[in-house]
């Protein structure tokens, strides 16, 4: 095995995070523009006229750049979306990450490769076979266990399931970062309680609050010892990353476009080192050091997700970050 057998994709939610991802050893980065992405309100979101410069930086570093256009789209937004696709094609974006079929088809019309978002919740070989006619890479559902992932990977190889470029479909999975209470991130809680749709990049993170339990028949309200009943811990797979490679995952995606550059740099570096260690046979000896470093940046505590067979999520016991190192804001850098 070689490190080049796998792709490590890091979040670039800002200029600083883009630099951190490149310096940390990412093979690719993903970013959003304006309101048509799942982090529409991230502080450092890019504009369409940033795309040529962003892609120039990526190409100079030998890194692929993926544009996320992965929200639910309405008719009044289609012209804006198509203009964005045209701008992305002119900037020679490496691929578009999409879930709404309007975005998938628009990307194909301007010659852009498509990666299928986790929002599609692709969970089996038949679904992957159907979507393969539109894409070359698919992010599988976060709720799959590794045996299910291996089954899909075997089908990709044996059938085979080919993408639009004529090559076997690449299987992408999230390897680190925040997890949503909703199925593969498709959640309506924020919409129904606050009028802001998580499926359109507006999530207000209601699930991160504490809640009480109410008996509707008797009107009794119970304050739970741990009220964070809807808030999952963060995903961390570095302890079993070798099992993910063995299951057939070829693209490893780090969540965190709303997180800071220190998070991006640390997490990207650790997972790059882990993939290199798997390739050269030194993986086991280094796990503890990665765990310690990952704990220093923003996290809500860690669990393995559903990959190892868990049936229910592990929830947090406090609000905000559990990082072992606390940061103090000292000022804003305005020029460099």
Annotate each PLM feature.
Residues 107:
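RNase H-like DDE/DDD metal-dependent nuclease/strand-transfer catalytic core used by mobile genetic elements
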Residues 110:
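Short, conserved phosphate-binding/catalytic loop or strand-edge motifs used
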């Amino acid at each position: 095995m070689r490190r080049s057998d796998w792709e490590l994709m890091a979040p670039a939610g800002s200029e600083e995070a883009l630099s951190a991802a490149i310096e940390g050893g990412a093979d690719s980065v993903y970013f959003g523009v304006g309101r048509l992405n799942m982090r529409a309100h991230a502080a450092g979101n890019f504009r369409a006229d940033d795309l040529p410069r962003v892609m120039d930086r990526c190409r100079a570093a030998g890194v692929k750049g993926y544009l996320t256009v992965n929200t639910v789209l309405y008719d009044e937004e289609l012209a804006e979306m198509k203009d964005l696709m045209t701008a992305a094609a002119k900037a020679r974006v490496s691929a578009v990450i999409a879930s709404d079929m309007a975005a998938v088809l628009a990307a194909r019309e301007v010659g852009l490769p498509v990666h299928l978002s986790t929002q599609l919740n692709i969970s089996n070989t038949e679904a992957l076979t159907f979507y393969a006619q539109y894409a070359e890479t698919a992010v599988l559902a976060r709720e799959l266990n590794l045996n299910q992932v291996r089954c899909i990977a075997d089908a990709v190889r044996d059938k085979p399931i080919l993408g639009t470029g004529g090559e076997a479909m690449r299987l992408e999975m999230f390897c680190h970062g925040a997890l949503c209470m909703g199925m593969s991130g498709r959640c309506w809680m924020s919409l129904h309680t606050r009028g802001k749709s998580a499926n359109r990049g507006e999530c207000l993170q209601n699930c991160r609050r504490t809640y009480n339990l109410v008996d509707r028949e008797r009107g009794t309200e119970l304050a739970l010892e741990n009220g964070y009943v809807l808030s999952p811990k963060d995903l961390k797979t570095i302890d079993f990353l070798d099992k993910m490679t063995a299951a057939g995952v070829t693209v490893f995606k780090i969540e965190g476009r709303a997180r800071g550059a220190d998070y991006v740099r640390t997490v990207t570096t650790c997972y790059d080192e882990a993939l290199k260690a798997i390739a050269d046979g030194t993986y086991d000896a280094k796990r503890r050091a990665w765990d310690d470093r990952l704990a220093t940046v923003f996290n809500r505590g860690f669990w393995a997700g559903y990959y190892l067979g868990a049936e229910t999520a592990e929830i947090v016991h406090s609000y905000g970050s559990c990082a072992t190192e606390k940061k103090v804001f000292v000022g804003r850098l305005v020029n460099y």
